[in-house]
């Protein structure tokens, strides 16, 4: 099996996993998407398809330079978001977009997910940030591209890179996560949803809860992700 065919099958499987694992409300409709970068192309879920009736050959193959469809069905409307992230951060090889319940709740509340414990610190070097709200001109002009720009701007403002922050909340929208592989990007989406629920529960149980100390946060992140990482359980 050639690499492109394998990646298409993985994308299809990952999109189905989002549904089966409860990353979306089944009764609401079809939202969320998974993509990967392959050479100078973005392979992404087609727009508005019934995944139960979708074949890997239907996966959209879009040129990153001009967003023109190369093969497959009409691509997801979110393709410009994925494309600008791939072009801005070469280390990103796969992206997952979900509207998972707890993480999207934080996004809709316009609140970054604070780090209250070491589980969060194991995966994120900082809070899980939320982007700024788009203004009316940005929404009307080029909505999806502006979302991508807002993600990049937030990371730059906080002096963070995709290795330090493997995902982000998009204001009033949902979640984008990324990784070096499709499996890693999907795993990071799961992590964000888990720590979003942890933070919600923790703040509910203790209204005066404080964020984890910077020293403990740094220790946990670096022992798992740093150049001298030694974490393992």
Feature map (PLM): residue ranges:
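Glycine-rich flexible loops
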Residues: 1-233
């Amino acid at each position: 099996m050639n690499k492109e065919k394998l990646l298409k099958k993985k994308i299809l499987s990952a999109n189905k996993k989002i549904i089966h694992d409860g990353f979306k409300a089944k009764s609401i409709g079809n939202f969320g998407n998974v993509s990967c970068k392959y050479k100078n192309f973005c392979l992404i879920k087609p727009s508005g398809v019934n995944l139960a009736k979708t074949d890997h050959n239907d996966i959209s193959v879009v040129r990153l330079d001009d967003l023109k469809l190369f093969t497959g069905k009409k691509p997801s409307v979110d393709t410009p978001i994925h494309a600008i992230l791939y072009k801005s951060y070469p280390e990103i090889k796969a992206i997952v977009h979900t509207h998972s319940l707890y993480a999207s709740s934080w996004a809709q509340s316009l609140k970054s997910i604070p780090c209250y414990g070491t589980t969060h610190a194991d995966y994120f070097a900082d809070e899980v940030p939320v982007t700024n709200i788009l203004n009316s001109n940005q929404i009307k002009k080029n909505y999806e591209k502006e979302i991508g720009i807002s993600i990049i701007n937030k990371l730059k403002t906080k002096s963070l890179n995709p290795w330090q922050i493997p995902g982000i909340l998009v204001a009033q929208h949902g979640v984008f996560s990324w990784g070096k592989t499709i499996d890693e990007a999907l795993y990071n989406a799961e992590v964000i949803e888990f720590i979003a629920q942890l933070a919600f529960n923790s703040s509910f149980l203790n209204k005066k809860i404080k964020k984890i100390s910077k020293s403990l946060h740094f220790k946990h992140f670096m022992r798992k992700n740093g150049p001298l990482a030694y974490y393992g359980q």
